[in-house]
């Protein structure tokens, strides 16, 4: 069994900087040689183009390896500790993702269509007795078009969502099935029949609420809950989508445009990174804490 390397903060920070710098260099080389390969083939300089093509693959491989090494360092030395501080029974897979079926089952009301799912940083655990799953998610749509020049059909992939996705199982039937979406004119036109106007102008301005029954939306989204969601959305760093499913699950998706546990352009400071990751995790746990206190969340048992 592979042992995790124990590193001091100074050593870890140096290793993180090294892999990030190397990854950046190889990414630039990959793009440059890739462009050069295209131009050389266009100029019919085939022998040279073949050489640059091989180098493009070599540089791309090195870029990928440094990216994987960076992710593993973060996961082993910072992310795992932050997750264990927040959740219990943690299972963390840096290169795993939420099952596509789970995402589809949410029935999230998006202003776009998607045909594929991928992601990373899959987390599974429990939070105060609730079963939780969380991961980076990327949704993309593949469309086909005919290339007149090559006289072939080509697939074109477009990213429509990139961000974080939480699934929390409350273990009880909820009092309704309600979806919240970032407000968009196109969505309002599509959902004239099942949209619900709430008694909060600011909330209506930010979210489109859809439900089979307006009463269920009013029951779940109390005035206090709407104020909390508005406040949380203001700190989310992207569009917020939510799905309260009658079976007991809550889905929260935030379109941040980035991965969760990443170094990015941040300074490679271990303590700051740890606090950053904890802060992002607490954004999600704050929503769960707030909902657990809501008397109107669960379906009331009726006597026989």
Where are these regions (language model features)?
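Loop-to-transmembrane boundary segments
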Residues: 17-29, 108, 113
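Transmembrane-cytosolic junction motif
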Residues: 57-82
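Cytosolic juxtamembrane N-terminal segments of multi-pass membrane proteins
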Residues: 1-23, 82
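Conserved oxyanion/phosphate-binding beta-strand-loop segments in alpha/beta enzyme cores
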Residues: 89
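Canonical alpha-helical transmembrane segments of integral membrane proteins
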Residues: 24-43
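Hydrophobic alpha-helical transmembrane segments
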Residues: 38-55
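Charged, low-complexity intrinsically disordered regions
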Residues: 80, 84-86, 94-145, 149-304
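Generic L/I/V-rich hydrophobic alpha-helical segments across diverse proteins
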Residues: 26, 33, 52, 56-59
């Amino acid at each position: 069994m592979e042992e995790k390397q124990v590193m001091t903060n100074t050593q870890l920070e140096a290793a993180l900087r090294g892999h990030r710098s190397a990854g950046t260099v190889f990414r630039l080389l990959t793009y440059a040689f890739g462009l050069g390969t295209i131009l050389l083939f266009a100029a019919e300089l085939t022998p040279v183009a073949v050489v640059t093509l091989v180098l493009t693959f070599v540089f791309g491989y090195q870029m990928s390896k440094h990216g994987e090494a960076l992710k593993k360092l973060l996961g082993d030395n910072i992310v795992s500790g932050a997750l264990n501080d927040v959740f219990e029974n943690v299972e963390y897979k840096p290169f795993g993702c939420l099952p596509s079926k789970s995402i589809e089952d949410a029935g999230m009301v998006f202003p776009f269509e998607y045909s594929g799912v991928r992601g990373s940083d899959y987390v599974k655990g429990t939070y105060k007795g609730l079963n939780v799953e969380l991961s980076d998610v990327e949704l993309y749509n593949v469309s086909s078009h005919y290339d007149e020049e090559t006289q072939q059909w080509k697939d074109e992939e477009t990213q429509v969502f990139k961000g974080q996705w939480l699934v929390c199982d409350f273990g009880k039937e909820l009092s309704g099935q309600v979806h919240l979406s970032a407000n968009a004119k196109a969505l309002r036109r599509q959902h004239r029949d099942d949209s619900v106007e709430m008694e909060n102008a600011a909330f209506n301005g930010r979210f489109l609420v859809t439900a089979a029954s307006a009463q269920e939306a009013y029951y779940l989204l109390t005035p206090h809950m709407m104020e909390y969601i508005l406040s949380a959305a203001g700190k989310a760093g992207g569009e917020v989508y939510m799905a309260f499913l009658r079976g007991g699950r809550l889905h929260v998706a935030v379109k941040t445009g980035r991965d969760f546990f990443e170094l990015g352009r941040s300074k490679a400071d271990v303590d700051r990174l740890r606090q950053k990751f904890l802060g992002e995790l607490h954004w999600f746990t704050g929503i769960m804490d707030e909902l657990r206190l809501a008397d109107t969340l669960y379906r009331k048992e009726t006597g026989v």
